[in-house]
């Protein structure tokens, strides 16, 4: 399936917005991309659509439980198998979600930043077929320049 067919089938749109196509094509070509777009500009589609076209799992780092829940609900309703892992789940639910993901049942998994450093998640990530990593909120990124000497 090509970009336009995937866009129509899963998201119901006939065309992409300005800037989306360039980001999506870059992802599908295997490039690292950075999309800086205003609220409501369709950032989520820029990783959700290629996630459906890539062979492995897409991990989305998102700090907001309500956003994760809304995104997963909308994706599941559109026929995309997605899940989230955050503090709203029990340990058993997290174990099941990671087990299902390992079996290839999910294309997209939303993960709270604090879950990235748990042993259970690290074990999963080391063995999973992860094709894309996305940071959905810029404030999840921390850059350390402690190794630089500035004048």
Predicted regions and their residues:
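Conserved helix/coil segment N-terminal to the catalytic DExD/H
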Residues: 91-132
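Conserved small/polar residues in nucleotide/adenosyl-binding loops
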Residues: 146-151
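Walker A/P-loop NTP-binding motif
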Residues: 28, 44-57
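Walker B catalytic acidic pair
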Residues: 137
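Conserved pre-motif I regulatory segment
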Residues: 1-36
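Pre-Walker A (Motif I) flank of P-loop NTPase domains
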Residues: 29-34, 56, 106-107
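Conserved Walker A/P-loop ATP-binding site and its immediately adjacent core
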Residues: 57-75
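Conserved helix-turn-beta segment of the N-terminal RecA-like "Helicase ATP-binding" lobe
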Residues: 69-90, 100
